[in-house]
């Protein structure tokens, strides 16, 4: 909450006066960067009953949440921090409940051990447990003072009006020397692949594989990933899943920031080695350019459709 709206009840009431505007926090992981902030949604001025302007008051509310939080003695309220800390720890522990996601998480933790990329979006339970109301407040102030700030707006308001509203709302933002972001670590693949097997009480095994790529040709890597395992017409789907029935699912993804290609699949334990070998054969086929024209055209169509659909979502435009 804020000094003016110290709890959820008063904060919700204030947002209700803005025709149901909503504000939520964001915690994102972009490569080796953690991006935190707030996102607000509100109706356009053209649709308010009496032509009310909402950009300015919503921006002001964002400024309050960021710069005028409710505190006591120069620190956040202990009860709020302990409650949110418990929620964070529960969320971290809950990651294991989705075994598919957990296999992918463990892949990155092992494959990128010692690199910032291995850190979870939500952090780890041990670090979360050490948070106090004072340490969190101090960290927040330092974060605002030294981090790069980006403001993204999607709507009908003129750019100058948006700039004025945001600058007014953030006028008290503490700013110091901006911390330089380190270069993203690019690690060479080891000579010998590593294999890690973990046992869990599940009915369906998960096979996650990761490859460090040497090419910096991003468009080519996107196309190759789609042909390999990025669509329902891909080699993994049509061969490993459909033709050979070695996996319940099999797909690939490409992380541009780290130049890493990953495979996620669900397999029966008895089919583990066959599935692993077949996935390797399909990847080798892509590396050698062994695909049909219809496979390439299908991948290109997927790229075009994805680009054309960007304007359908404000979140995607961001």
PLM region spans:
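His/Glu-based metal-binding/catalytic segments typifying zinc-dependent metallopeptidases
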Residues: 1, 141, 148, 167, ...
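Hydrophobic side chains in well-ordered alpha-helices
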Residues: 58, 139, 162-165, 220, ...
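M16 family metallopeptidases and their MPP-like homologs
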Residues: 8-64, 68, 100-123, 148-154, ...
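Non-catalytic, conformational "gating/processing" segments within enzyme and secreted inhibitor domains
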Residues: 133-169
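Short secondary-structure capping/junction motifs at helix and strand boundaries
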Residues: 69-81
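Second-shell loop/turn segments in exported
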Residues: 2, 46-51, 73-75, 93, ...
